Amino acid sequence: MTRIQREEPLVVSLLDRLLDDEPGVSTEAAKGRVQVLRELKQSVRRDLEILLNTRTRCLAWPPGLKELKQSLVNYGLPDFTGADLGSAKSREQFCGIVQAVIRQHEPRFKSVRVQLLGGAEPLDRTLRFRIDALLRAEPAPEPVVFDSVLKPATGAFEVKGGADE
């Protein structure tokens, strides 16, 4: 006898459920799977941008406090303000750091890969990279792609994509 698989409903994060996009409306219509998935991707994009624009402390933790390295106290990227991202090797290392930080702090991803994208012009110092990930969703993981930019003048990251445009 075959077992009927019941599809688990997709649910956005608790924070997104508590935020009210339309405070003047007292009731909300039920959302379909496609709309919930789109909202989930948008919230992941927003949270990725926050993660990449957050800096961790510069100093190493005392040797006896190893757990802090894996905790939320260590949320964000190391400060790279003085880093030379001009060489291909340093850019690849930077992408590796970004990938490791996303893996550590974004549990909604099943897998993550960060790859460097070429610049539009030879003198353009903007660092462009793509985040390919599998978003945990039922019944099957959903592939998402985020095109990201590090603006050298401000040190700010901009993350685009993820949702069906």
Labelled PLM ranges:
Residues 112-116:
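A short linear hydrophobic-aromatic micro-motif
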